[in-house]
């Protein structure tokens, strides 16, 4: 019988899994924000398209199988625009769905979201503009209002073996807030560079896996191209 109690760290195998290496952790919650609606929308569409088709993402080169995605934009009247954005990135829309909510309030929507996740079994869940269904948009920045939502999303990510990405424009969230820091493992920001490109940088990394910035451009049709 092996009674060894000393284990060298060289024998330790990392257990963390990634949907997008060092940016979108598996079974966890990430946050994406930026001042450009077009850039954030195109980046989300590119991520979703890559997952739906089983393609590698920039500076990733991970071999992945095609997976399902729930893409929920809480702004009214966005379904046609979302589909057009996904088609521009050559996504497989048969692997992408949204939940037809019977409610309007944020927490009720999040509770109902679980049924959609359980039924569709997505690899990725993207929730965009969730502030639109909160009582006040500024409630997104209130830790007491966001804590139960974030806690429930973290449960979904672990229970249903998926990554969850929250996306907003121009947030004022304090990333060091206890509830936010305990739940959201990766925070990414889209910024415009002087060269006319957009830069995706990680502004917070709770998993201690720093990753290099990536750049992309938008063409006249708002289609994303990696630089």
Regions found by a protein language model. Name each.
Residues 1-91, 180:
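The Walker A/P-loop phosphate-binding site
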Residues 1-26, 93, 107, 111, ...:
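Core recognition of P-loop NTPase motor domains used across DNA-transaction enzymes
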């Amino acid at each position: 019988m092996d009674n060894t109690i000393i284990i060298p760290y060289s024998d330790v195998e990392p257990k963390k899994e990634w949907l997008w290496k060092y940016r979108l952790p598996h079974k966890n919650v990430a946050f994406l924000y930026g001042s450009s609606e077009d850039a954030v929308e195109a980046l989300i569409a590119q991520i979703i398209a890559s997952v739906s088709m089983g393609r590698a993402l920039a500076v990733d080169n991970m071999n992945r199988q095609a997976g399902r995605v729930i893409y929920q934009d809480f702004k009214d009247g966005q379904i046609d625009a979302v589909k057009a954005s996904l088609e521009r990135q050559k996504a497989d829309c048969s692997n992408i769905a949204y939940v037809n909510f019977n409610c309007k309030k944020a927490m009720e929507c999040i509770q109902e979201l679980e049924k959609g996740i359980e039924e569709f079994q997505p690899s990725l869940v993207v929730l965009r503009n969730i502030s639109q269904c909160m009582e006040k948009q500024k409630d997104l920045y209130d830790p007491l209002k966001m804590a139960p939502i974030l806690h429930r999303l973290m449960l979904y990510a672990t229970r249903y073996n998926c990554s969850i990405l929250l996306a907003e424009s121009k947030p004022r969230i304090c990333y060091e807030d206890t509830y936010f820091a305990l739940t959201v493992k990766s925070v990414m920001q889209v910024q415009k560079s002087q060269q006319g490109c957009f830069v995706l940088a990680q502004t917070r990394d709770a998993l201690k896996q720093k990753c290099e910035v990536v750049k992309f451009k938008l063409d006249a049709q708002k289609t994303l191209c990696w630089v």
